[in-house]
Amino acid sequence: MDVIIIIFIVSAAAAAFYLYLVFPTRVSKEQREIFANRCYAHRALYDNKTDRPENSLPAFEAAMRAGYGCELDVQFTKDKKLIVFHDNDFLRSSGVDKKVWELTYDEIKQIKLFESSESVPLFSEVLSTINGREPLIVEIKAEQLTNEWYSELCDATLQMLRGYRGDFCVESFHPVVVRWFKKNAPDVVRGQLVNARRSSPNIDPIIVFPVEQLITGFLTRPHYIAYKEQDRNLALRIVQKLGAMSVMWTVRTQERQNELCKAEDAIIFESYTPAPFFNKHG
């Protein structure tokens, strides 16, 4: 009998400790109404074979006209200008073998995206284009992960968003970025981006595992979890039950969306044109 009691106490303590580690910030009804049941265009509504490449001003304008929210990527240039661009370098987009943080914005704006006439926009230009018409998911790309660099990047992003008249949330793969917003802007809806170990074979599992299992939550207390669509796991389902929203990326077919939207709060999509809103329960 004593052994059973000890096992029960240890199990209860372990469960309580796990819940402490993963417990999210519960999303309010108002926040859920703004961000949930929506489809967000991944890097805007783009076509890299046209003059509407990803994360370009024409792509954002197209998304707004279609009624989509947008997911976008923000990072610093060498001279610490905020730009909207996804990759760490310009090889894929432009054939230029330079890191984003190695070039000033004046140098970057000479680079054309995917053989189009478009160049990389400033974050301020994107915000002006969107002009509060639809909600934004702002991913903060903190690849230069020194304390000074990511703190300045987060602060610059926050200050620009504070002056923006529109709905937005922020997210990052890096828990230190999500924690920065928890400490410095707790009112801003924040999300933890997650890559599972099977999707990140080149990253040390010691780094991936805590984020994948959401046990960095005690540092970040995110409002939502953004998971790669094939990597949904038990940890995500638990955190959903505890009050977090879930966002799935990147969905590429209507059929896959129909499967996912029964369980997910929001969808980040590309390569097809869904309805801007969906009914989570069918």
Feature-to-residue mapping (PLM):
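Phosphate-group recognition and catalysis centered on beta-loop-alpha active-site segments
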Residues: 1-282
